[in-house]
UniProtKB/Swiss-Prot annotation:
This is Protein snakeskin. The gene is Ssk. InterPro entries: Ssk. The chain crosses the membrane at residues 7-27, 54-74, 89-109, 129-149. Required for assembly of smooth septate junctions (sSJs), together with mesh and Tsp2A. May be important for barrier function of the midgut epithelium. It comes from Drosophila melanogaster.
Amino acid sequence: MVSVETVGSIFIKALKLIINLVIIFLYRWGDGGEFLGIGGTWNLNEEKSADAEIVASGVMVGFLIYTGCHTIAFAFGTTKHKGELCDTIMNVVGCIMWIAVGGVALHYWKGYMSDEGFLYVNSERQVGIAMGSLCVIEGALYLLDTVLACIHYSKGDTDYTQ
């Protein structure tokens, strides 16, 4: 029989994939069809930090691939991979990285002012704040998935505990 933790984990992984895709679309086309980006620094020209953009795009694409592969593995119905320590470690890393990327985005876009007449409220800023908020929510989902992975691991269904 399928456990509640397994169903919850599959649901959370599907939700993580959907939110991850939304974040990638906002990141790439969030500025009226142009590149929005994470931001990451204020300077004289209001240019975005290349370092923050590289890390953010790596987190977004990397965890999309990892979560997609892991969700497909869940669909095969075997119980061996559910209690692997690797899943727990990747969820902890995902939680930290998503919250860090979301924090950088929120920090940048909260203080962002448009070039057009010093407008404090504009669509680019609002989309940036929404993207940062979704990144923090994604980090919270990875934390919740970490808890479920720890429950799977503690149940002792793997060869490691025998």
